[in-house]
């Protein structure tokens, strides 16, 4: 087989990896092999946590709606069930914002759906 001299391509590749890991501690920012492993791990963690953030935000909305409901003596699943029966199309994000910013409107919505 013929010899392939990678030249500047290999240097550019290594330089980009080390540039990405420049803020990491110790050998993870100095040595190419460990830096490459840490870059892959960092990107995997980033993707995982982007998905987990969606889960956590939805959990926060539900907690806020539930807290506002319990101030009025209602439970969360009751209000969600009533909204689906009455065909009220408000998602949890909007409902949580209404509950926090304008509680009078929230209780108006609760009365409207018959809770």
From Swiss-Prot:
- A GO molecular function held by the record: structural constituent of ribosome
Disulphide bridges in this chain?
none
- Localization terms from the record: Plastid, Chloroplast
Q: Does the keyword Ribonucleoprotein apply?
A: yes
Top-level division of the source organism's lineage: Eukaryota
CDD domains documented for this protein: Ribosomal_L20
Stored InterPro entries: Ribosomal_bL20, RIBOSOMAL_L20_CS, Ribosomal_protein_bL20_C
Q: Which Pfam families match?
A: Ribosomal_L20 (PF00453)
**Where is this chain primarily localised?**
plastid
A GO CC annotation recorded here is: ribonucleoprotein complex
What keywords does the record list, in alphabetical order?
Answer: Chloroplast, Plastid, Ribonucleoprotein, Ribosomal protein, RNA-binding, rRNA-binding
According to the UniProt entry, the coiled-coil residues are none
Q: Its Gene Ontology biological processes?
A: ribosomal large subunit assembly; translation
Q: Which NCBIfam families match?
A: rplT_bact
Q: Describe the function of this protein.
A: Binds directly to 23S ribosomal RNA and is necessary for the in vitro assembly process of the 50S ribosomal subunit. It is not involved in the protein synthesizing functions of that subunit.
The molecule here is called Large ribosomal subunit protein bL20c
Q: Which organism is it from?
A: Angiopteris evecta
């Amino acid at each position: 087989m013929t010899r392939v001299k990678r030249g500047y391509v290999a240097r550019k590749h290594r330089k980009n990896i080390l540039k990405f890991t420049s803020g990491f501690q110790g050998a993870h920012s100095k040595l190419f092999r460990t830096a490459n492993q840490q870059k892959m791990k960092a990107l995997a963690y980033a993707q995982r946590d982007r998905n987990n953030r969606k889960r956590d935000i939805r959990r926060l909305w539900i907690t806020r709606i539930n807290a506002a409901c319990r101030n009025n003596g209602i439970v969360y699943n009751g209000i969600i069930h009533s909204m689906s029966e009455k065909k009220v199309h408000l998602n949890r994000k909007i409902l949580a914002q209404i509950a926090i910013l304008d509680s009078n409107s929230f209780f108006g919505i609760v009365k409207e759906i018959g809770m």
